[in-house]
Each structure stands twice: as C-alpha cells, then as structure tokens.
C-alpha cells in the first residue's frame, strides 16, 4: 500500500525518512491496537493477544507469529512488514508538497491493513519528524492494481486483495553454470551465523539463506510449511562465487525508543556479479525483489533487483573454476 501525504508546512526529513515514518506509525498503532495500555502493563511480553495484535505482528514479530516454538529469538524472526520511502532523505519539502511511503505486509500481517491505514492517518495528523509537522494523508493506493484503498474524500476503506507468492522448490539437478548480476538498491547487510556479528559481505549463499528464511517464515505465518531441502540448497549456493563487486558502504543511525539510545546500522549498495549454479535460484532471487533479504529490512534495507542472468556455455563454465 502506498500512503500519499501532503505537507502542512515546510518539512525536512533526516537521512532515512523511513525510520521517521516507521516510528510515528508504530506509536499510533500501539494507541489503537494495544489492549495492555488499559491495564498499565508495558511491552508485549505476556500479552494474551500477542499473536493476533496488529502492532506485535508488524513491530514485534515473534516465533508465535510464524508457528515456531520458543527456541527462536524475536530478533531472528523476519518482520512481517517492510516500509519504503518514495524520496531521498536530507531534503526540505515545501508546504503543500506530496510525498509517499509504501508499506508491504506479509503473511498474516495482511490482516492488519485497516489498523495500519488508521495509524498512518493519525501519524500525519500528529505531525512527522522532530518538528511535528502536520501532514494530511491524502490517499492510500494499492500499488499492484493502482486502485484507491482509502482517500480523504470518501474516508472509506476498500481493502486490497492480497497477492500470493507461490514458489516451487528450486530443482537440485542439473547444476547448470550461469552468471547473475544483482543490484543492491538499498543497503544490504547480513548476520554471520558463526560469529553472530553483522557482515557487509554479500556472499551468494548468504542472500539465498536469507531468502529461504524469509519466504518460509512468511508462508508459515499463513499456515503453510515448506518441505524444501534447505540443507542441499544451501550447499549448492555455496558453490557460487563472486566475480565482480562494485559496492559502497552506507552507515546511518536510528534512535531506539526501547533502548533509549542511538543504534548504528550499516549496509552496502551497488552491484555484484556471481558465477556458478545460479540459474536454479532465479525464481527465488526474483521473489527477493519483493520480500527483501538481509538485516533491517523493516527500516527499508535489503532491496535487491536482478540486472541480468546468463547461462554460460560448457567452455565458459569450465574456465570459471580453473585456477590461473
């Protein structure tokens, strides 16, 4: 859903406008969705409706939202919401300017659409950025159909029809060699499983691993379990090598209300060329253009696009793996 606002007066967004909108949206979503506000309890821990709450589904996604047990930490569960900004940060918009934010909801979080729309309207009325600039929500548009979901003129919600993303398991044989070029549109970063630290190295296996986790989690949140051979797919993905990198590191900070401190976030943008058994992963990678990959996707990171995919001839593919 694309949320179109009109600035009530001159407004200047910080480096990452998405973080500003996400914070304002979350604040208003708590106000309309949280039942614990009436009991004096703080946080989502122990809430009896945690798994059904619109706020927790989008902001505090946990194992229960994807049908998993308590062995998985919340930070390892892919968020069911991703936000995009339709403009760059660190710029001043004049009074009356139109600007957009896009919210994508995955799995069971799609049920939260009405709450998100009301919260987005309230966020604009309360004011955006630290200057609390009032911004009127003009309309909400379904990007997939270009139809109006809500407008200030009618003040009626016409819920968008959910789009399904049905993928078949990548075929394990044969392992045709190919070349794939990817663009990292917004900063991409990954969590290294061995060390637990954040890495900016866009290894192909890390991209595939992230996409497998995200897609399986979104499917599970809708009650569908994937019976794919994840171990075999991961082993094949590790055979893919980086042929060329043109990357630029991006560093920024966000203020964490929960931690009451600024939290650094990093990632890389640019292009990467991969060579090896990439063709079998083409559908999964293309799905990644929708579901994102890596860390901090809820803050707009992890947006990728496929530049090209080429099947290599036998001679070309054999030369790739010969040490010079």
Model regions and ranges:
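RNA-interacting cores
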Residues: 1-324
């Amino acid at each position: 859903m694309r949320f179109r606002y009109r600035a009530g007066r001159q407004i200047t967004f910080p480096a990452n406008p998405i973080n500003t909108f996400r914070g304002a949206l979350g604040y208003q979503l708590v106000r309309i969705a949280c039942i614990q506000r009436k009991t004096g309890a703080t946080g989502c821990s122990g809430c009896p409706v945690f798994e059904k709450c619109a706020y927790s589904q989008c902001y505090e996604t946990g194992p229960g939202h994807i049908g998993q047990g308590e062995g998985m930490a919340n930070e390892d569960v892919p968020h069911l919401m991703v936000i995009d900004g339709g403009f760059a940060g660190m710029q001043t918009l004049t009074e009356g300017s139109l600007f957009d934010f896009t919210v994508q909801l995955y799995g069971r979080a799609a049920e939260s659409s009405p709450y998100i729309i009301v919260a987005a309207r309230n966020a604009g009325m309360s004011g955006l950025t630290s200057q609390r600039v009032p911004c009127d929500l003009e309309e909400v548009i379904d990007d997939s159909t270009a139809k109006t979901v809500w407008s200030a003129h009618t003040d009626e919600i016409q819920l968008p029809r959910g789009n399904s993303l049905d993928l078949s398991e990548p075929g394990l044989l044969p392992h045709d060699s190919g070349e794939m070029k990817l663009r990292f549109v917004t900063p991409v970063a990954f969590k290294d499983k061995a060390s637990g630290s954040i890495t900016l190295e866009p290894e192909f296996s890390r991209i595939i691993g992230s996409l497998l986790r995200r897609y399986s989690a979104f499917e599970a949140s809708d009650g569908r379990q994937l019976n794919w051979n994840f171990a075999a797919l991961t082993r094949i993905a590790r055979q893919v090598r980086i042929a060329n990198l043109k990357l630029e590191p991006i560093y920024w900070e966000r203020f964490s209300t929960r931690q009451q401190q600024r939290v650094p976030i990093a990632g890389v943008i640019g292009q990467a060329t991969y060579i090896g058994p990439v063709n079998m992963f083409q559908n999964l990678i293309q799905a990644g253009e929708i579901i994102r990959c890596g860390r901090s996707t809820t803050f707009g990171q992890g947006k990728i696009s496929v530049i090209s995919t080429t099947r290599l001839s036998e001679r070309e593919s054999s030369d790739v793996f010969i040490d010079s």
